[in-house]
Amino acid sequence: PTKSMEVPGGSSITVTATALKGSNVTASLGGTKVKLKQQSNFVQDENGTKLDENSDFAVYSGKISIPASTSKVQSLGRIKVYASFNGLSATMSGASVSVSAVIPTPEPTPTQPDTTEHPSTDKPSDTTDGGTGGNVDFNPSKMLTPYAYAGVAGRSKMCEITSLCETMPANVVDDCVPYSSPLPAGTFDYISSEYTYGGSKYYRLASGRNILASKTKLIAQGYNLPQNKVSVVSSSSNSDATTIKFGFTWKVPFNVAVKNQSYIPSSQASGGSLYAVTAFNGKYVDITFSHSGNVVGKINVSGSKIVSAAQWITDSKAKTLTLRLTLRTPGRFYGYSVGYTSDGCLTLKIKAKPASSLSGSVIMIDAGHGGNDSGAICAYNPNSSKKYEKQINLLLAQKIKAKLEARGATVIMTRSNDTYVSLDARANMGRTKNPDMFIAVHCDSSESASPMGTTAYYYQAYSFPLASAVHKRIVSAYKSSIYSGAGSATLNKIDRGTNMYPFRVTRIEECPAVLIEYGFVSNIRECKLLWSDSVQERLAQATVDGIADYIASN
């Protein structure tokens, strides 16, 4: 980073620098020094632009830990980066960094305990039950807010989420992670501290996460609220989903995360990702409610196709309640939706397996870029009117759509012509249109003309199986037909892997979501192939076959 920033204590800052390949690169801040690691296949931006692989330079990256916050702002000075190579050395300065001060937050006052039914504080309690589940009286009009006195002494700095807001763990300053889920509009929380990064203001919440301040309404003197009680209003299952409705004393923050998932070491992952996988093997879905200590009502999952058991876990020290839903089959998960519905309940839907074949599946195809967002410029142009990545993306997407529909699938397009659709709007379609899967169609680009090949990207671990299945088919199509007869020097460059990266359109929870880079438009030979109608047909067929493989094996 280069802009001045004020960051929360206990977090970390990612420092990146460009230096000659093979250099020794370190970064220092406030007496802390770290070694930066050279990164491979580094993605520069949301467009997936790659660095020139043949360049003498590479990107180096590492994290600097920030000391704990105190009652006053602490100045750490400027980030300094040192690089040395074969007797040459250079030093550069980056952002000026300070540590934000702590804002005192109150201890929630417990509500009157409900002695008729609540979880054990020592171990998980099984709340699976027959019948409809829930059946607890809940009146949303009686929910408390920080805008009115709630019987608890004192007032605090608080905020209300005003629109769906992505979150980051408290120790992360500027990056999203798959185990930190978004918060819906209407959620309240105490503000522990605030900081600025990249010109944007962030709040660190008492629940242990960081959010963009622009997604909230500040309540400078909010009335303190009591400890929350969770009421299970209802639970049911059908062929589409397992649905659980919750009522609250007040709209507390919560987090949804797939647990017991294995990740590969960052040193083995493309770009050094901390959350890359080689398979999806998650066993549980944990829904953790902050500022909470009591629950009433039972959950019925007896008819669920996706969940086999439900347990409540309490953590009295952290003041959280966690509902653990055990997956009926480990490694089989198809997404979830959660938000407040018109009845005032927080409604969680765990999606069941949508269909057993392409026929009956609902698939969203996202043709990347469009309108005034042209994407990358093509190195080869069939004629003066065909020269942008956005055009190839749409042609490919239309062919994929036709082939899917021919096999009985329903296809939703984020765009069907040359129009601009924002990244947020595309992601929102994936959240609200209820597709079974989301596939973004893109072409790659580099600062150099030499890189070639195809890459698949995922964000959530449960999106990896779809990304991998489609990628394998596309690689096979290139090797067996599109580049048929090519030498090993070409064939060995085709498979660029199935990689984790937080593209905006893959950061959705409602279904498996992937982004496919079909080839490099910056490579003249490959760009010419990507403009070929017959090659587009083969790539579209490979995509459809990959989707079918995913459905059959998952």
Q: Could you say what each language-model-derived stretch is?
A:
Residues 377, 438-447, 457, 492-554:
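Active-site-adjacent mobile loop/cap segments within catalytic or ligand-binding domains
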Residues 1-11, 16-18, 22-26, 30, ...:
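Short linear recognition/processing motifs and adjacent strand/loop elements at protein termini
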Residues 343-429, 433-435, 452:
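Active-site histidine-acidic residue metal-binding/catalytic motifs
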Residues 390-406, 428, 432, 464, ...:
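Solvent-exposed, polar/charged alpha-helical surfaces in well-ordered, non-transmembrane soluble domains
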Residues 369-372, 416-421, 443-448, 461-464, ...:
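Solvent-exposed loop/turn segments at secondary-structure junctions
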Residues 173, 177, 183, 387-395, ...:
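Soluble non-cytosolic domains of exported or imported proteins
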Residues 465-499:
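Active-site-adjacent substrate-binding region
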Residues 373-388, 445-472:
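A short, glycine/acidic-enriched catalytic loop
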